[in-house]
């Protein structure tokens, strides 16, 4: 990544649980990978939905990503600095909204590894011109509640709940 920072679009998708006394935006403002933009999962979700952090609508995603200046043929690299692996959520969002899966990556080891390896960081932000990002939803990547309910009888697909027991 370090050798290709000028050829890729980098996003810090760090997110912390409420009450953690950490602020991902403040951390980003202090230090981040050069050229990175902060991807605020709170603000870049479906704000019209009563539930928090829901996937934005296609029109919302188009606006969000266009405002970041990302083009459909950009290689996007996402990282985070939290234990929640929020970078994977943003990775999935790019794939769901039609970005070429070969052009979306999660930084191996995240920002922690980047820092351990003493790679360059900055507090400077880079501005990008607005783009006209095109969205093509891959609706087959999300299973709806009605499909889960139906599957209780049909056993059409295997479902695994990876949450902790708590």
Give short role names for the model-derived ranges.
Residues 52-146, 150-151:
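Thiolate-centered catalytic microenvironments shared by cysteine-dependent enzyme domains
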């Amino acid at each position: 990544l370090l050798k290709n920072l000028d050829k890729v679009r980098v996003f810090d998708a760090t997110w912390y649980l409420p009450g953690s006394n950490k602020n991902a935006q403040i951390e980003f403002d202090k230090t981040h990978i050069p050229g990175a933009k902060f991807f605020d999962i709170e603000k870049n979700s479906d704000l019209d939905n009563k539930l928090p952090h829901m996937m934005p609508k296609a029109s919302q995603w188009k606006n969000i990503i266009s405002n970041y200046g990302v083009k459909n043929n950009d290689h996007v690299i996402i990282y985070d600095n939290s234990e929640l692996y929020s970078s994977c959520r943003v990775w999935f969002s790019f794939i769901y909204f039609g970005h070429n899966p070969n052009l979306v990556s999660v930084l191996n080891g995240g920002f922690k590894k980047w820092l351990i390896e003493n790679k360059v960081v900055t507090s400077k932000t880079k501005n990008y011109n607005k783009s006209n990002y095109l969205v093509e939803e891959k609706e087959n990547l999300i299973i709806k509640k009605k499909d889960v309910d139906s599957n209780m009888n049909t056993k059409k697909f295997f479902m695994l709940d990876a949450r902790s027991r708590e």
